[in-house]
A protein has these predicted regions:
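Non-heme di-metal
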Residues: 2-367
């Protein structure tokens, strides 16, 4: 049966599962089954920004003075980032949103997808300011074998889930458990994408920024990284609610059943990111960064993500020792201390309200 955009039956959505429950009716944000998603949504909305707010005037001159190997690193990463956010600019709404049962998660996913579109516009903003003809970069993305090879692993679980969900929803082909299994793997794939696949390219852009090169681009990527940390938190919360039995009970056994497959997905991603690092530095490394350091960094990030999911760390890098400690202040908004008139202030939150203030907090104030 086709889904309705407005279910006229009364439903207590605080008792529904996150996915494949009753069709939704009123979008209400006063009572929640999982309040964490509304809090995440509020945080993301408070971080609203536009790439045009960041000046790229100096970046154009910096890029023109780059050596060929530096241009290769910067351009290849931009192309790869464009691919990833092209997937995420439509993936969450296309794949997950039709099957969401909770208003708070629905709102969170819509905001998530909207910010991914800002990221895609950001890459266009950088290209239009740095290259004489941005089309020369855009038109070669689908011709780049290294990028297309990555597109397969990035999208295959999304596509498998959307196909299975469509077959079940509209044709009653397959089984609900199989659809849920593919949903679980698709969400794990998103967690890997948001939590690891960007970080080699992030590190390279931040390394240029550390050298006072392409600083505008580095600040834009820092804003994107801040957003991606929220998107990572979203998928991490979904996965942990499933594995801990706090949502759909059937997802507990599905999580256990898929555990080794998930570890293989992480291994595949780490191998691909290491291969990408080698491709970036095939003509030479850059000051402060080389493929060996990036290999360690990829394993370090992967282990941290696995730990956050409550899974075992399967790589050699210790989770408490960052091989690239200087990247941290680019990934932390509060670490960038700048004058407001000079650049985009990343730690500024729009519409931030503290709602848990009691009467005691106002003691000592008088009018």
């Amino acid at each position: 049966m086709a889904k309705s955009v407005f279910n006229q039956e009364k439903v207590d959505f605080t008792k529904e599962h996150m996915f494949f429950g009753a069709d939704q009716n009123t979008q209400r944000y006063d009572v929640f089954r999982h309040p964490v998603f509304d809090k995440l949504n509020q945080t993301m909305l408070g971080y609203f920004w536009r790439p045009e707010e960041v000046s790229l005037q100096k970046d154009r001159a910096d890029f023109q003075n780059f050596r060929p190997e530096q241009k290769h690193i910067f351009t290849s990463n931009l192309k790869y980032q464009t691919l990833l956010d092209s997937v995420q600019g439509r993936g969450p709404c296309l794949a997950f949103l039709p099957h969401v049962s909770l208003p708070e998660l629905e709102g969170c996913i819509v905001t998530w997808d909207f910010f991914e579109t800002i990221h895609s516009r950001s890459y266009t903003h950088i290209m239009k300011n740095v290259y004489a003809d941005p089309a020369e970069v855009f038109d070669t993305i689908l011709d780049d074998k290294k990028i297309i090879a990555r597109a397969v692993s990035v999208t295959k679980n999304y596509d498998a889930f959307t196909e299975a969900a469509d077959n079940w929803t509209h044709h009653k082909k397959g089984s609900m458990r199989e659809v849920k299994k593919k949903l679980y793997l698709a969400m794990q794939n998103v967690n890997i994408l948001e939590g690891l696949r960007f970080y080699v390219s992030f590190a390279c852009t931040f390394a240029f920024g550390e050298l006072k090169l392409m600083e505008g681009s580095a600040k834009i990527i820092s804003l994107i990284a801040r957003d991606e940390s929220q998107h990572l938190a979203l998928s991490t919360h979904v996965l942990k609610l499933w594995s801990q039995g706090k949502d759909d009970p059937e997802m507990v056994s599905i999580a256990k059943e898929c555990e080794e497959e998930v570890y293989d997905m992480w291994r595949e991603c780490v191998a691909e990111e290491k291969d990408w690092a080698e491709y970036l530095f095939k003509d030479g490394s850059m000051i402060g960064l080389n493929e060996t350091l990036l290999h360690k960094y990829v394993e370090y990030i992967a282990n941290r993500r696995l730990k956050a999911l409550g899974m075992k760390q399967i790589f050699d890098a210790p989770v408490n020792t960052n091989p690239l400690p200087w990247t941290q202040h680019w990934l932390s908004s509060s670490g960038l201390q700048v004058a407001p008139q000079e650049t985009e202030v990343e730690s500024y939150v729009i519409g931030g309200i503290k709602q848990d203030v009691d009467e005691d907090a106002l003691k000592g104030f008088s009018l």
